[in-house]
């Protein structure tokens, strides 16, 4: 099977976005939002030219081909994050005990989950905002990984253990990920 001598991926840079490549560090900035990420892998070169981010690899192996695609997705997510941002929606569900959810500082506190006396907490990652309004929790931010991890932390904090999950369906569940309804 013939092997490509060069793999080259190009990403268009929107007008209001500034992308800087310094060694292996890629910085994407738009207005007040800025994301930096270290993208280092042997044999892969990242540069900017003519309003595009270029990712190149000469004589790539299978792993390098995969990493080029991964880096393209990371940079595209960084550009989308600083321009539009990412938003996850979670829904609070309870049947037996009404729970109270509030976001303070860098933690989300969940009181009275399944009638428990102690408070459950979930960590909010850096640069992520959490808004609780009624039965809905909205997690938003520029970094897709941090927004997703914060939403997962909240969902995992209300995991039901030691009870029949067919009966006890109380919890906080992700219903929308970055615009995609689940």
UniProtKB/Swiss-Prot annotation:
Molecular-function annotations in GO: rRNA binding; structural constituent of ribosome
Q: Which GO terms describe its biological process?
A: cytoplasmic translation
User: What keywords does the record list, in alphabetical order?
Assistant: Ribonucleoprotein, Ribosomal protein, RNA-binding, rRNA-binding
Matching SUPFAM superfamilies: Ribosomal protein L6 (SSF56053)
Record has Ribonucleoprotein as a keyword? yes
Give a Gene Ontology cellular component term annotated to this protein.
cytosolic large ribosomal subunit
Is Coiled coil found in the keyword set? no
Q: Which domain of life is it from?
A: Archaea
Homology family = Belongs to the universal ribosomal protein uL6 family.
What role is this protein assigned?
This protein binds to the 23S rRNA, and is important in its secondary structure. It is located near the subunit interface in the base of the L7/L12 stalk, and near the tRNA binding site of the peptidyltransferase center.
What is said about its interaction partners and assembly?
A: Part of the 50S ribosomal subunit.
Stated name of the protein: Large ribosomal subunit protein uL6
> What gene is behind this protein?
rpl6
């Amino acid at each position: 099977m013939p092997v490509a001598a060069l793999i080259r991926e190009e990403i268009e840079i929107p007008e209001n976005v500034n992308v800087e490549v310094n060694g292996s560090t890629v910085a994407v900035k738009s207005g007040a939002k800025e994301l930096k990420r270290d993208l280092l892998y042997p044999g892969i070169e990242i540069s900017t030219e003519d309003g595009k981010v270029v990712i190149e690899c000469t004589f790539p192996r299978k792993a390098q081909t995969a990493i080029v695609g991964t880096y393209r997705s990371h940079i595209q997510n960084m550009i989308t994050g600083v321009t539009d941002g990412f938003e996850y929606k979670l829904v609070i569900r309870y049947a037996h005990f009404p729970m109270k959810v509030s976001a303070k500082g860098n933690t989300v506190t969940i009181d009275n989950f399944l009638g428990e006396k102690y408070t459950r907490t979930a960590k909010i990652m850096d640069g992520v905002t959490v808004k609780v309004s009624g039965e809905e929790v909205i997690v938003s931010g520029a970094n897709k990984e941090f927004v997703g991890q914060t939403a997962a932390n909240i969902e995992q904090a209300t995991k039901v253990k030691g009870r029949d999950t067919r009966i006890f369906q109380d919890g906080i569940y992700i219903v929308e990920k970055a615009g995609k309804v689940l």
